[in-house]
């Protein structure tokens, strides 16, 4: 189909169980030369609002090249609409769904290596909304700056983290942390941002999803909830 694997060129493909889509992000950073770059998923794409469960109708709602070009004439970065946690903060949601110590260690690393971002980290952690999924479109020059910052923090966190006791889900640690870090990085940038819908090509049982999140938040009952 013409796809290039992320195990070519300069890569961290072997880290995929822990870094998730970030192995593709790293590959693009190190191997591509282009004006603009973005990240979507095989089942999650930027697009127009669509209410149908029909997969073909969902596919037709996915942004075209023209849609992206029109937005990028007015904005510096395209982002997914924020997820609203409503009843808790970004920090408490992470602590309920994942391991608190990993977020705490990330905060320490930022204070040590990028103290100018500490206030942004605190602000994002105290908010109730978050851009998730690591999805975006921006200029490659801006993307390079983001990746330099992001992977410096994540590689340091990896050095300080023993993953031997982590189950498969929690071993995706660096993917989860990166979603929060992306918002921290954005908080420090003075960018013209555009939030757009995400087209989910799979059918999600939203009532069940909401119930699961409520159980985690209200009763501290663990579920396998991404992000």
Task: Pin down the residues of each PLM region.
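ER/Golgi luminal nucleotide-sugar-dependent glycosyltransferases, focusing on the catalytic module
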Residues: 1-227
């Amino acid at each position: 189909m013409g796809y290039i694997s992320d195990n070519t060129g300069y890569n961290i493909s072997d880290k995929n169980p822990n870094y998730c889509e970030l192995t593709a992000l790293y590959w693009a950073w190190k191997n591509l030369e282009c004006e603009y770059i973005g990240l979507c998923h095989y089942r999650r794409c930027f697009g127009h609002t669509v209410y149908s469960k029909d997969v073909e109708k969902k596919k037709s709602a996915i942004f075209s090249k023209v849609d992206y070009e029109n937005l990028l004439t007015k904005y510096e970065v395209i982002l997914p609409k924020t997820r609203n946690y409503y009843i808790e903060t970004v920090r408490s949601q992470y602590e309920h769904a994942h391991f608190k110590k990993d977020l705490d260690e990330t905060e320490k690393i930022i204070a040590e290596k990028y103290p100018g971002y500490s206030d942004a980290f605190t602000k994002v952690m105290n908010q109730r909304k978050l851009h998730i999924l690591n999805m975006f479109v921006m200029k490659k020059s801006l993307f390079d700056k983001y990746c330099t910052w992001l992977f410096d923090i994540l590689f340091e966190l990896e050095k300080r983290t023993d993953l031997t006791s982590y189950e498969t889900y929690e071993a995706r640690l660096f993917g989860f942390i990166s979603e929060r870090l992306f918002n921290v990085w954005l908080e420090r940038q003075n960018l013209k941002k555009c939030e757009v819908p995400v087209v989910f090509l799979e059918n999600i049982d939203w009532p069940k999803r909401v119930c699961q999140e409520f159980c985690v938040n209200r009763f501290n009952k663990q579920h396998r909830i991404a992000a």
